[in-house]
């Protein structure tokens, strides 16, 4: 029987694809380091809104330099202004509730629950844009709910904080809304520029929250370690994560990049266990794997 010869893949093409997967993995790992800086700053008695202010202020400065280095302009239209303000609002809500949840539950579990947002994107698209819900979407949602049930009791056997769970849910649904808006509102500008303006408007909303409902104006850091962790949060899980993601999408596309996003909560869980002594049991591992599996299925099926 004659066999169809396998296509020969040039070595350079294989190396190029490998770089794309490496960039996607690095993007996810970088984003998963959020708890590392946040929890160290919490230990120095800084509030979530203060930590986020320094994270995004640093990121905005770094992205400003990146845009200048690329020779891009900062001009935006009135329509783009309105969309970017909305992006900034949901970005602020998602970030604030996510960081606040670290006060009520292990950061690794919070990061895993945040990763439910791809499922929520599918539900939002079905409800508001009449996108058909396929069988694999229903299966993914059911599997993720089993995973959440397994996570209901933390590693020490104590039920998860209701406040913490609601904060993470608010964070994931806010991020899902942000993703749906970004998908439906086609802005004629690059990802770096969109993120720069979203972060700038996010800073405005964070300051409004701080002075009205939060801890007041962000205090000036007084320790070198505080500045170091603040800079780390602005650079690693924000700017580097974005740059690596953009490079990955250009090389291998959005679907493989989204699938490798599963490394985000894996990184956060690893940091929680190794650095902060968070407890990880067999039941929690099973719950985490079910949630990651369900969201990876969603990412793999969505085109």
Region roles according to the model:
Residues 63, 85, 133-153, 172, ...:
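Hydrophobic transmembrane alpha-helices of multi-pass small-molecule transport proteins
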Residues 2-50, 54, 89, 93, ...:
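Glycine-/small-residue-enriched transmembrane alpha-helix faces in small-molecule transporters
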Residues 2-3, 52, 56, 153, ...:
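C-terminal-most transmembrane helix of multi-pass membrane proteins
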Residues 36-48, 103, 152-161, 211-230, ...:
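Membrane-interface helix termini and inter-helical loops of multi-pass transporters
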Residues 62, 67, 98, 117-142, ...:
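C-terminal transmembrane-helix exit sites in multi-pass transporters
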Residues 28, 54, 110-116, 181-204, ...:
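Helix-helix packing/entry segments at the starts of transmembrane helices
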Residues 1-29, 60-86, 127-138, 156-163, ...:
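Membrane-interface interhelical linkers
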Residues 30, 35, 67-108, 113-114, ...:
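Specific transmembrane alpha-helical segments of multi-pass solute transporters/efflux pumps
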